[in-house]
A protein has these predicted regions:
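Short Gly/Ser/Thr- and charged-rich N-terminal loops/segments
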Residues: 154-159, 177
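Generic N-terminal targeting/processing segments that precede catalytic cores or assembly contacts
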Residues: 1-151, 155, 182-371
Length: 371
């Protein structure tokens, strides 16, 4: 099965199925000497663990096992393998579905491609695979924090005249100062849930009462809801991206769209750009292009929005097709989310970090030697 590896230099390969023995990830290309310990993973997984009223009742501890690539608390420069055992799997929940293609899922598509499929919760197509990405994101973020290239003057945002910027180009768009070591930060938040626009809601924020009530009604009806989340990446040095086919937004789009529940992405002002004049779109005190120009980071905040589809596993009766070609009416049982907005956020964070880590390494030794 192809397509399990992402990245060019900093590569991420995930493995395992939703209700198999374990899932995991192998990260290659990470430089040696990066501090990395188990606590780095557990802190992130504690935040990402489903716990709310509108989230799955499946409770995986996600206790990481570092199998290789780390010694005495630092990376070795060799492949890093991290294993996450599945301890709360219930494959029997899906036995009634083994000859049924669930609408909105990858069941039929996988069988059409491979002539067989893992019907236990979707196998590789399950959201469970995302935990392996989160683990890889932990490593990528550590690399971004500690890799010396980030702190060199070569990779800082500069004005067109080559002089260092004065710090701020617009409200919320801070450019890294020349020669400083501002850490890259990735912040993802929901800006619309169940069709209700909202002020940014982080993964740890309480829901506004209006949205909470709407989701409660949707859950009561045995249905699900979608969302729009926004990601803002601050202190990204100017110059990252590989035109023309590996532009920064192209790589970010591929990374984010590879997340199973994401169905759309827009950078900066996104589709609103179609309604703007050139003079409006080019306003230097705005960030309508989302911090990327010509496929290369320009030192402003990178901003994009991602569309999260409604969870396809719902308790309502739906028309479904069977392996024999019949159409039946069936309601899906089991442990499923009402809305994925909170659970998708750490996955987006991880994929963004992976892209930036890879792009930083792709910038090339020749550039580093000029510093």
């Amino acid at each position: 099965m192809a397509g399990n590896t992402f990245g060019t230099i900093f590569t991420v390969t995930t493995f395992g199925e939703s209700h198999g023995a374990a899932i995991g990830v192998v990260v290659d290309g990470c430089p040696a000497g990066i501090p990395l310990k188990l606590e780095d993973f557990t802190a992130v997984f504690n935040t990402a663990r489903p716990s709310g009223t509108f989230e799955t009742a499946r409770r995986e501890p996600n206790t990481p096992e570092i199998l290789s690539g780390v010694f005495e608390g630092k990376t070795l420069g060799t492949p890093i393998a991290v294993l996450l055992r599945n301890t709360d799997a219930r494959p029997h929940d899906y036995e009634a579905l083994k000859d049924i293609y669930r609408p909105g899922h990858a069941d039929f598509a996988y069988e059409a491609k491979y002539r067989r499929r893992d019907w236990r919760g979707g196998g590789r197509a399950s959201g469970r695979e995302a935990a392996a990405r989160i683990a890889a994101g932990v490593i990528a973020k550590k690399m971004l924090t500690h890799y010396p290239v980030l702190h060199s003057a070569q990779y800082t945002a500069c004005k067109a005249d080559g002089k260092p910027p004065d710090g701020t180009s617009a409200a919320g768009e801070n450019r890294p100062q020349h020669g400083t070591s501002l850490p890259i930060t990735i912040q993802t938040s929901a800006i619309e849930i169940a069709g209700i626009p909202c002020a940014p809601i982080s993964a740890t924020d309480e829901l506004p009462s209006e949205i909470n009530s709407k989701l409660a009604s949707i859950k009561q009806a045995g249905d699900s809801a979608g969302a729009i989340v926004q990601c803002m990446v601050r202190n990204v040095p100017a110059g990252l991206g590989e035109p023309v086919f590996d532009k920064l937004e192209a790589e970010l789009a591929k990374a984010v769209l590879s997340i199973g529940s994401v169905k759309g992405i827009a950078f900066g002002a996104g589709f609103q750009l179609a309604r703007m004049s050139g003079s409006e779109a080019n306003a230097v005190d705005k960030n309508h292009h989302g911090g990327i120009s010509g496929g290369i980071s320009d030192g402003k905040d990178i901003v994009f929005q991602a569309v999260i589809k409604p969870v396809p596993s719902i308790a309502q009766e739906q028309i479904m097709e069977t392996a024999s070609g019949d159409r039946i009416t069936h309601a899906i049982t089991g442990r499923h989310d009402v809305c994925l907005y909170r659970r998708v956020m750490p996955v987006i964070d991880a994929m963004v970090a992976i892209v930036l880590a890879d792009m930083m390494l792709r910038q090339g030794a020749a550039q580093i030697l000029k510093v």
